Amino acid sequence: MQAQKTLASAIQIGDPVSVKKAIRTLKAFEGIVEEATEGELANAASKANRTGLLCCPHTGVALAVLEKLVSRGVIKKKDKVVVISTANGLKFTDFLFQCHTDKIPGVQSHYAFEAIELPAKYEDVRNAIREKIEV
């Protein structure tokens, strides 16, 4: 099996070594498999970034799939769900930059941050932050 290129590079595995173990675990816990497009994962990650969590692309996949399963009614409003983020978005600065500057080919960012250019002075940065959030 040949893996396709993806923004979520750490899960870009064509023939995983532990595929049998993964299938056993899915069956044991009545799990399901779903996929996310590049646009879905980028927008889910960008949406999470707005909460203050700098989301990695792999967590973006999990969040995009969560949204799909909720919208299809597979996951109900009363259900309790945990999404584990195993990496910090700061390890994926290129991904974050591309998401928030609309630079991912074929993907329109719906949750991009507004860039603010500031002089490299503490007071200017502090004042800009104070204007954007309640302190």
Question: Model segments located where?
Answer:
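Active-site/ligand-binding loops adjacent to catalytic centers
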Residues: M1-C55, C99-V135
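Short amphipathic alpha-helical segments
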Residues: F95-F97
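Claisen-condensing/thiolase-fold acyl-transfer catalytic domains that form or cleave C-C bonds
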Residues: E38-T93
